[in-house]
Amino acid sequence: MIKGFGILEMLISLSLGLGILTVIIAHATETGRIAKKITSNQERLEAIFHTVDTIKSDLNKCGMRLQEACKFFNIPSFESSQGNFKVTYGLAEEELLENALPGQQTLKIAQNEFFKKDKVVLIYNLARQVWEFNEIRDFSGGALVLKNSLQNDFPGNSPVLVLKKVEYKFYPAQRMLKRKTDKGNFQPLLEEVSDFYVTFFPDANSVLYRIEVNKKEQIRGYIFLLNLVQP
């Protein structure tokens, strides 16, 4: 008798080996899929948390430093429509160091790092009941240079506010919520968004927002606009 494995035994052994290898490969593949899914879920959750924090931060700032101007001049600091909302707030405030006359394109104020080129400014005076928006061209020679000539007469000590505007917009076709600041372009904030809406309650100075992701997860937030003053 010849010692060793017969052909049948070798085939059985080979089949068992291939079976074990197939199980190992299948297990490794499934493990990889699970790990990838976990990573994807974690990234989505992080994106959702970041979006919620960003919305909350912007809404909490809405109307900041604009309380006086909004009350007397009916300047909106919150606006909303279907799948869209805008907030405006003041970044910094200075007072005119000298009178500013109609036709003038400079404002004498203390130098402030927030008063940068292309930023929108609000100049107003309660006693004269005048206000207007303008844009910064430059800061030169201790004065703020404006892009447009003044339309009104502003005495010294009139407040000058530099503003920040933030806008959120839902793009249903792209399934994406985007955000932009001032005159910038809309940038992606959250993907796979299947629905987004905002409801403003003027009597309570509050906002309810709802984000739906992949038609499964829903995130709701209710925030009081503590800095918002209505006329």
Task: Show which residues each predicted segment covers.
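Aliphatic-rich helix starts adjacent to a transmembrane/signal segment
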Residues: 2-56, 60
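Short, exposed beta-strand "edge-strand" segments with a Pro/Gly-rich flavor and a Y/T-containing core
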Residues: 4, 99-100, 183-186
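Mixed-charge, low-complexity intrinsically disordered regions
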Residues: 8, 35, 42, 52, ...
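Residue-level signal for the start and early helices of compact helical domains
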Residues: 22-25, 29, 35, 39, ...
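Extracytoplasmic beta-strand-rich oligomerization domains located immediately C-terminal to a leader/signal peptide
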Residues: 34, 38-172
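Short linear sequence signals and composition-biased patches located at protein termini or domain-edge surfaces
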Residues: 76-80, 164-167, 172-231
